[in-house]
């Protein structure tokens, strides 16, 4: 017996061969198996119950496809691994620090194997049956097709992979890298191998079958008072003290007719003995038979077994943990699993038919059995050239494409984002992390801030930090346009300048259509006067103006004017003709020459009418011609006036000169031109109010420099610019103007620079959330998309989202990326946010899990954030290395301490390295506590 036990593992498998396109593993009883490695399609904590149902349907489809005489074995291996990331030698200091911080961090890896096994014929000798062999390969192919059709990632294992898989299972070693075998020592409680033990926990005690009466493919976990869909056994990813957990799930599909007859006979036996227990048993069996008749389900034999590897002294807490978690699911695991070695061997890959039917298997419906199958995978990194690293819910770095449009999987149409998070939610820390990673991947970033949140990272990357002050105000010349910009992109500039002028002139009020028309015309003519100075109207322009003014004149004509004009024409006809000198005739307009000719002809015709010798028909014809000529003379007199008016207009335009482009010259141009337009068009416009309101930005005004100083052209070449305008955030006039011209700077930069560009506006965006700016903001967002850009706004005020239609229409509706941080402070009004952002029930549930999980152990400061890209959303952790924290910090005390180290060591990188080394050497104090000590001594720690 002892000799037999020593060689017990030798007879597990008969053969491993590659045949007919499949690697087939034969058990000792001749049962062939093919092994797929798959990825469970449901991401842990996705909160979407429908995904669990869909995977349940896929597994049910596979069972129906393979049918009787087959077993489906699924093994989910949850093994502790050590994190490693290959960092390029030329990586930035903060990036190297980031991955060094996570190096070696323990995490749970999930690998899933799906094993299809054909039952061997029960006989003394194993015989080759070509039909069964072909059927086996056909079922493997159909299973492959189902997984492909349902978009479940999978692959068949090769020969070496199957061999390694079986050997690793025997050694129970699934950590990456080499592994070795060691001796086994079996007992009734567990198997001992080296310094670890392996224990089996069958989910079902065959003698009692303590399972819930109703079961679903998922369960609900209570988080913040909300039921969140999760896997029935999701707790397996967090079994304490374990280094490896294998959840072995086996379903055998027996002959259905034989089992049905057996159940029907059993129901009759129970019915023949009329006592309460038999009536209940009969009712249960009949319910099962009814289900089988109605639904596409089958009777199956099952075994579910959890194998755990842990130190010998941790068996009790591991057992207690599993029993508690299973009890919460309504499952009482077997307490009589004394056949530990047998259970371990039965769980080997391809051993789906090795279980003892007397005490290892229980009978149930296939739909119920599949509810116990593990369905989750952990969050994975995305395939994308633009990588933004966050952590998953267990603290493992994963990269995503934060734009949603640059990765292999396209999720968005634009990369614009909207971020909301209350004070203290980690909003600025998160944005610092995003900006760092964008900068390190060749993105030009322009930021508008109102609280020095980005001073540290701007200094680290040698960016340009422009802070507004009275001594050095932020000043630009938004009116300056190059000839090329004027010819190619004047429409955009014109709309921006209109928004700027109305922001000053009207504030938050809508401009009237007349005001919009006037300002639009002055801007167009202003640039036309600069780039194409006016000399004279062309013939075609004159004719067009003539027709326009003629229509306007007729529009205002009335009967009295007509009568008066006709009387005047009669006087001219009846007045004695004056002889004109030849030189004066040469100076006449064509219309004047025609007028004189018509008058002479009318006089001749009048003489004919008065001639007694003329016949009546001649007189009538002459009278008709006179009336015709008089109408022409009437029109001709209007044309003469119009021609003179056009001459006057021509002279006015000739006098309008623009020598340089600036607000000053536009102001002068507009004040001269607007009265001319209003007089011509006969419209009203309060030019005095307009002049008075804009005067403060004009020559000699308090804010003259704001719109009349050329911006440093070198700014367009800067990779990172931060505009800090906290000192004017309460100025209702200057604040929105400065924000607006900064946005214009970004648009110019975006057109000039190649590659990715990002404009991020923190709380300052509220300055431009006015009705007059709605169209411009929409335009900005749409234009950014065309030039490989990102426009983002960040806010912490709930009312900004709920109460502003501009936010919804101009910003949210044009932002395919939405970012939310902890929303518990907004819980009472969360329905309003959800409605405006268009959140689904699943997305709401995801948001409720932010910072609500018990996942802080062994991790430093971090906050969680919900990111939605198109329809794809998830919760991520924002956890950074200490070096990154020092670079991002917005705490004044910490910034002052860092400046002391900077003064000592010369470079910010060296200062960050030394201050973090000293903090750890001083006992790993909190950042703020250590900073206080540094500030107290006013010197670096080595000099204390």
Region locations from a protein language model:
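P-loop NTPase motor domains
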Residues: 49-65, 331-332, 344-398, 404, ...
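Short secondary-structure boundary/capping segments
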Residues: 87-92, 129-132, 171-172, 350-353, ...
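Extended, folded cores of ATP/NTP-driven motor/assembly subunits in large transport
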Residues: 1-374
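Flexible coil/linker segments and helix-coil junctions enriched in charged and small residues
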Residues: 87-95, 100, 123-128, 132-133, ...
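Conserved P-loop NTPase motor cores
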Residues: 396, 404-425, 429-436, 445-454, ...
């Amino acid at each position: 017996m002892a000799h037999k036990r020593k060689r017990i593992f030798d007879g597990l498998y008969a053969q491993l061969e590659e045949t007919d396109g499949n690697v087939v593993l034969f058990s000792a009883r001749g049962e062939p198996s093919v092994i797929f490695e798959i990825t469970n399609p449901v991401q842990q904590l996705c909160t979407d119950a429908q995904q669990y149902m869909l995977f349940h349907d896929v597994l049910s489809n596979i069972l129906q496809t393979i049918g009787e005489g087959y077993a489906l074995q699924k093994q989910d291996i949850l093994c502790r691994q050590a994190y490693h990331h290959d960092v390029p030698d030329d990586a930035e200091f903060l990036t190297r620090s980031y991955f060094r911080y996570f190096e070696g961090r323990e995490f749970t890896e999930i690998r899933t194997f799906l094993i299809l096994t054909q039952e061997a014929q029960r006989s003394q000798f194993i015989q080759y049956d070509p039909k069964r062999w072909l059927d086996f390969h056909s079922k493997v192919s159909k299973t492959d097709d189902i997984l492909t059709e349902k978009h479940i990632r999978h692959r068949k294992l090769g020969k070496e992979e199957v061999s390694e898989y079986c050997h690793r299972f025997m050694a129970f070693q699934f950590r990456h890298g080499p592994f070795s075998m060691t001796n086994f020592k079996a007992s009734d409680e567990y198997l001992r191998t080296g310094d670890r033990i392996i224990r089996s926990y069958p989910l079902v005690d065959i003698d009692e079958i303590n399972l819930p009466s109703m079961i679903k493919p998922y369960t609900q976990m209570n988080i913040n008072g909300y039921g969140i869909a999760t896997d029935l056994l999701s707790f397996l990813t967090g079994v304490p003290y374990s280094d490896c957990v294998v959840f072995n799930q086996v379903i055998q599909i027996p002959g259905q007719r034989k089992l049905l007859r057996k159940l029907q006979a059993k129901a009759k036996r129970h019915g023949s003995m009329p006592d309460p227990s038999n009536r209940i048993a009969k009712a249960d069996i009949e319910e099962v038979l009814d289900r089988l008749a109605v639904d596409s389900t089958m009777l199956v034999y099952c075994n579910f077994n959890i194998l755990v590897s842990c130190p010998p002294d941790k068996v009790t807490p591991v057992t207690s943990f599993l029993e508690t978690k299973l009890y919460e699911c309504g499952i009482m695991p077997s307490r009589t699993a004394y056949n530990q070695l047998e259970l371990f061997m039965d769980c080997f890959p391809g051993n789906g038919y090795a279980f003892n039917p007397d005490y290892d298997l229980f009978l149930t419906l296939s739909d119920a059995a599949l509810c116990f199958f593990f369905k989750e995978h952990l969050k994975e990194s995305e395939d994308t050239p633009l990588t933004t690293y966050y952590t998953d819910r267990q603290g493992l770095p994963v990269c995503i494409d934060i734009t949603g449009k640059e990765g292999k999987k396209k999720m968005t149409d634009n990369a614009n984002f909207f971020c909301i998070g209350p004070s203290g939610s980690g909003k600025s820390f998160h944005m610092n992390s995003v900006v760092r990673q964008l900068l390190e991947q060749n993105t030009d970033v322009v930021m508008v801030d109102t609280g020095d949140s980005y001073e540290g990272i701007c200094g680290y990357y040698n960016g340009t930090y422009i802070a507004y002050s009275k001594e050095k105000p932020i000043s630009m010349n938004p009116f300056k346009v190059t000839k090329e910009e004027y010819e190619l992109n004047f429409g955009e500039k014109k709309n921006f300048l209109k928004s700027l002028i109305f922001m000053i002139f009207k504030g938050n009020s809508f401009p009237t259509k007349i005001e919009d028309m006037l300002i639009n015309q002055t801007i167009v003519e202003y640039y036309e006067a600069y780039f194409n100075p006016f000399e004279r109207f062309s013939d075609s322009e004159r004719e067009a103006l003539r027709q326009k003014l003629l229509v306007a004149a007729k529009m205002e004509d009335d009967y009295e004017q007509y009568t008066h004009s006709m009387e005047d024409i009669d006087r001219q006809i009846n007045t004695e003709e004056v002889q004109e000198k030849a030189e004066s005739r040469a100076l006449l307009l064509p219309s004047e020459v025609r007028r004189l000719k018509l008058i002479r002809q009318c006089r001749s015709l009048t003489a004919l009418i008065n001639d007694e010798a003329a016949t009546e028909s001649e007189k009538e014809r002459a009278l008709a011609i006179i009336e015709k000529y008089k109408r022409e003379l009437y029109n001709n007199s209007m044309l003469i006036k119009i021609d003179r008016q056009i001459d006057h207009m021509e002279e006015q335009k000739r006098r309008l000169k623009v020598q340089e482009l600036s607000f000053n010259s536009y102001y002068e141009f507009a004040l001269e031109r607007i009265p001319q337009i209003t007089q011509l068009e006969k419209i009203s416009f309060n030019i005095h109010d307009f002049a008075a309101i804009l005067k403060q930005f004009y020559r000699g005004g308090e804010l003259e420099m704001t719109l009349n100083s050329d911006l440093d052209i070198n700014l367009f070449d800067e990779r990172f610019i931060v505009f800090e305008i906290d000192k004017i955030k309460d100025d209702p006039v200057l604040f929105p103007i400065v924000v607006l011209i900064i946005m214009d700077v970004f648009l110019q930069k975006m057109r000039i620079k190649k590659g990715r560009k990002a404009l991020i506006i923190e709380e300052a965006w509220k300055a431009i959330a006015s009705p007059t700016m709605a169209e411009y903001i929409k335009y900005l967002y749409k234009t950014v998309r065309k030039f490989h850009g990102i426009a983002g706004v960040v806010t912490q005020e709930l009312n900004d989202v709920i109460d502003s239609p501009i936010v919804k229409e101009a910003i949210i509706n044009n932002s395919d990326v939405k970012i939310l941080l902890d929303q518990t402070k907004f819980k009472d009004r969360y329905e309003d946010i959800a409605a405006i952002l268009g959140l689904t029930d699943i997305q709401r549930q995801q948001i409720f899990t932010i910072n609500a999980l018990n996942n802080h152990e062994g991790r430093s400061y971090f906050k969680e954030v919900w990111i939605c890209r198109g329809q794809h959303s998830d919760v991520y952790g924002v956890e950074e290395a200490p070096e990154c924290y020092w670079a991002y910090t917005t705490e004044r005390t910490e910034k002052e301490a860092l400046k002391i180290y900077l003064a000592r060591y010369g470079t910010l990188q060296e200062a960050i390295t030394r201050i973090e080394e000293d903090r750890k050497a001083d006992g790993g104090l909190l950042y703020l506590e250590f900073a206080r000590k540094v500030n107290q001594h006013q010197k670096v720690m080595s000099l204390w």
